[in-house]
């Protein structure tokens, strides 16, 4: 790091009554001072330790400067702090907070790993290790909530949702997807919701080829999650919510065999349209009288030719009216084994899965989980797992903020309010002191969260 302040300074001669000089000359300072909260959240979850335990060392020990667990933590904490690209490693190599998060001495510790070292790490992980790391993510999150709820959840909802991950190079298994209209991967994200809580917790994120059918891997993911959830919450009722891309006979038969409740959207066809027609006629009459969007709910028994048996289908017959446009008919169908009224099943159970879209937006826009620019498919799978781990830490941070104004904040807002704090670091033989700004706007919330993860007044 250069100590030549003449090259690190800028001067403003007309911003105030005095000349204003800005210097980047504080080696013991960082702009991520609040990120120590993430380390506390990680210790509560045991997440990076569990994922690092899945890694197998392949390097010559005499030449190792960065242990595998340090490399993993370096990437996870950097992603959570907003540094999604491995190229950011060069800027963060001497950052005292980033070193502290990894487990090194904040001031005197050796520099963190470089981008080439991190790239070699990403490309050295095999599919077996990736599978174990994905299981470690699910196990850590589920175990955390088993402790929180004392194993007494009444109902647990599993949501799977595919999303597109646009690719812009020659990545392995990148294909053109006609639905999304670009070259991409097609990952699937898995979330669990406990009882009627507002948060959906990420427990799985599996990268898939860009031309993968929506159902690819879905049964395997559900089976593994159900086994873990039943072991952790033996008395909980499991419920599965899926969009129409997952509606296939194999999945319905699997869910029936597992004896779980489900609500799964289904695409319209001529037979279902015929079942919906009486309801659509009522909706047309209602919207003609009111001039507003109207919908009517009903149900029918239906069995496609490929199905093993007849199932209940809830119908939403809707006519949409928008100003300046002709009315648009919009019948919707949901396959379910719930016994509630059609309106309740659709509006209370199925529509609630819309919150999953907000979680996926956080992953894309808050943590850039689609930063999958490695050539190897497995390296990109590792990247999304590390980003998923960073998101799990941010969700734990949000959970700890439950009694503050940050309780429902998006990831980017949490980062700005709680992590992006200027800090000057002082070390001694016995302690590390973080000098944070007295004028921090959310200092009370920060202290409250810190106490929830074990900090005590000093």
Feature locations, PLM:
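Short, conserved catalytic/metal-binding motifs centered on acidic residues
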Residues: 41, 74-75, 88-89, 114, ...
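Short, glycine/acidic-rich hinge or "gate" loops at secondary-structure transitions
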Residues: 90-92, 105-107, 238, 401-411
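Short, glycine-/Ser/Thr-/acidic-enriched flexible segments
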Residues: 163-165, 208-210, 269, 320, ...
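Basic, amphipathic alpha-helical segments enriched in Lys/Arg and hydrophobic/aromatic residues
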Residues: 369-440
């Amino acid at each position: 790091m250069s100590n030549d302040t003449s090259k690190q300074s800028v001067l403003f001669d007309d911003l105030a009554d005095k000349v204003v000089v800005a210097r980047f000359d504080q080696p013991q300072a960082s702009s991520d001072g609040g990120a120590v909260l993430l380390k506390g959240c990680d210790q509560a979850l045991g997440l990076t330790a569990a994922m690092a335990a899945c890694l197998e060392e392949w390097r010559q020990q005499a030449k190792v400067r960065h242990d595998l667990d340090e490399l993993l933590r370096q990437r996870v904490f950097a992603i959570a702090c907003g540094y999604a690209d491995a190229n950011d490693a060069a800027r963060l190599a001497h950052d005292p907070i980033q070193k502290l998060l990894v487990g090194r001495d904040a001031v005197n510790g050796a520099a963190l790993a470089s981008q080439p070292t991190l790239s070699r790490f990403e490309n050295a992980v095999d599919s077996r290790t990736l599978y174990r790391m994905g299981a470690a993510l699910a196990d850590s999150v589920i175990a955390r909530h088993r402790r929180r709820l004392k194993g007494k959840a009444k109902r647990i909802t599993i949501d799977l949702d595919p999303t597109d991950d646009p690719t812009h190079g020659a990545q392995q298994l990148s294909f053109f997807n006609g639905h999304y209209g670009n070259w991409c991967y097609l990952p699937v994200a898995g979330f669990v919701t406990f009882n009627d809580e507002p948060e959906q917790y990420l427990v799985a994120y599996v990268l898939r080829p860009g031309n993968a059918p929506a159902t690819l891997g879905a049964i395997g993911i559900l089976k593994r999650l159900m086994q873990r959830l039943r072991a952790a919450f033996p008395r909980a009722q499991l419920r599965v919510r899926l969009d129409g891309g997952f509606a296939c006979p194999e999945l319905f038969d699997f869910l029936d065999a597992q004896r779980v409740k489900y609500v799964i959207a289904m695409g319209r066809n001529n037979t279902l349209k015929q079942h919906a027609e009486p309801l659509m006629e009522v909706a047309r009459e209602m919207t003609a009288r009111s001039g507003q969007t109207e919908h009517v709910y009903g149900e029918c028994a239906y069995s496609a030719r490929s199905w093993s048996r007849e199932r209940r289908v809830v119908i939403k017959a809707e006519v949409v009216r928008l100003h300046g446009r002709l009315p648009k008919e919009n019948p919707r169908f949901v396959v379910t084994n719930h016994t509630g009224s059609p309106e309740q099943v659709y509006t209370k159970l199925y529509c609630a899965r819309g919150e999953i879209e907000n979680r996926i937006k956080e992953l894309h826009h808050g943590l850039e989980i689609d930063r999958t620019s490695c050539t190897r498919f497995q390296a990109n799978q590792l990247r999304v797992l590390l980003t998923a781990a960073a998101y799990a830490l941010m969700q734990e941070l949000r959970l700890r903020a439950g009694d503050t104004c940050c309780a429902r904040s998006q990831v980017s807002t949490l980062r700005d309010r709680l992590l992006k704090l200027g800090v000057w670091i002082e070390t001694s033989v016995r302690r590390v002191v973080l000098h944070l700004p007295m004028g921090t706007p959310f200092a009370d919330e920060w202290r409250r969260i810190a106490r929830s993860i074990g900090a005590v007044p000093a």
